[in-house]
Amino acid sequence: MKQVLWFIKTYFTFVILFSIQKPFFMIMEKASATQPIDNIWSEIPTVMWYGLSLDLSMAGYLTALPGLLFIATIWFRKEIIRPILNAYYILASFLVSITFVLNAGLYPYWNFPLDSTPLYYFFTSPKDALASVGGLYIFFALLITVLLTIAVWFALRMPHTQKRYSSRYSNYGFGDFGSGRRTRYSDIEHHRMRHSLILLLLTALLFIPIRGGFTVSTTNTGKAYFSQNAFLNHAAVNPMFSLFESLTHQEDFASQYRYMSEEEANKLFAQMVSSSDQNTYPLLNEEARKNGKPDILIIIMESFANDIMPSVGTHKDVAVCLDSIAKKGIFFPRFYSNTFRTDRGLVAVLSGYPAQPTTSIMRYPAKSAQLPSLARSLAKAKHYGNAYYYGGDVDFANQRSWLVSQGYERIISDSDFPIEDKLSKWGVHDHIVANRLLADIKKEQNAKQPMLRVFQTSSSHEPFDVPYSRLKDKRLNAFAYTDSVIGNLLREYSKLPRWKNTLVLLVADHVGAYKEHLDNFDRSRYQIPLIMTGGAIARPMNVKLIGSQHDIAATLLGQLGIPHKDFLFSKNMLSDATPKFAFFDVPDAFGMVSEENSIIYDNKSKKVVYDKGKKGYNLKRGMAYLQKLYDDLSAK
């Protein structure tokens, strides 16, 4: 069973090596922290704990090949396998060492964990990449890398530097075959097969730490994010994992969607963006405007479409609560989603940043950390506190890292609920999360600080298993369930004193699940509800202006008199000085809707697939908008 012990020792050697990198990094890079840390030593155990999932995953990747080679030593002479294993250990030692050195060396300049960016700069222009560091710096970096490589290789080799001993199967990994009494060939085969199966099982089990368990989300750098202090999050990230994640997701954004010259794109784009709040139509009542600090609750509804609302859609018995709320509140019937996926819709709503057709900025923590933030803007201008409620796995699609970088102080997710509440594939049902949200609101009724709370629903998603049975159609019943949860939540909230100074905003993340066969080239595929209610609104109204999700941030901040110049793509829909249009995209197409024209363009076929109104009016505008979006994405 030597090979099994070698396997276990190899795996945990990698884990230990990755773990001890963290305190060294923290001590060396403390001066580079952009936020103060009172006691660096007390933070080390927490950083190591939160970074452990990435360390376990990376160790799994690095142990997979040795696992297979250990099996080979059972069937072939070790003289054949040992050189291969040695070469692999040298390579692995170098990679572990160089990623640590690069991460530590570059962090003071870039203040984010190692990713593919330095490789991109180095291979495109080595001279420029090295121009900012001196020869002595490079020499010491190389020297440290070599010394660390030797040390790591020695640590990995230690389990294999064992005194040779004799037993009857040595030449096949079990001792010296042929010494002592002769052994039946079937006995040898039996031992080989048994030990091979054990090692094969252990190697296969590496899938668990590599993936990060059996939850919906897979391991990603966002799992290490836990603190409002960015330095602590960065210290917890495994640099080797971060680099390989970035390499496998790397795209050259600057070369995508090049429809026109930069000059022409800039000219058209300038006509479509504005940070003006001139002559903004007020939605809040006089008391709320005077106070200027209403509590804000944003409910982001999974997959809701206008079509399931009785007054504007074809279904008269699904979103009945939402329909009632819209009639008594402020309803935007010509509002559009930016996208077809939740992660992109969340960024559009809360960061005012349009979705991208071929990627999601949430996948890139270094880029998503640079996004503007509704939560941060409210906190900075009017000292809002905040909390985010979601019954699912907040590590899915790197959502946690984005939320933390957005400045959310409390993130309540599936891990904050008892195991008996996790009854759905996506975690906790909406009514349980709503009850937790309501309990927190009641608890904080007398707080002086205004609050931004975000409630992201999840139950109206496949497989549509909900604790509710009003409608026969499983999909529609799931929407009816979430609709009832929202209705009950707002009814109970309205009984509280704080309601009179509360603005509630309800919006879908995207259209999905219903209808069953959605057409990406149909404009109705992107029409979603935007509703405002609460004691702080002036009166019920129907706002027939055109807008989309990324306009919410500027529109909301405009109502509160808060500047929003950092939200480049977001515009105040209620200002008479801003252009009125909606933009959306899916792989690989984009659409733009305005009073003049509605258009959808298929990038793959290079054809306009939907064109209504003034023919082609929005084609160049949409192209310029998408081109500038990818310019901005590349620059982050």
Where are each of the predicted segments found?
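Transmembrane and membrane-interface helices of multi-pass
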Residues: 2-253
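Alpha-helix initiation and N-capping motif
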Residues: 17, 116, 126, 237-241, ...
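Short alpha-helical "patches" and their helix-cap loops
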Residues: 80-84, 255-265, 361-366, 570-572
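The feature marks either
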Residues: 229, 236-241, 245-285, 292, ...
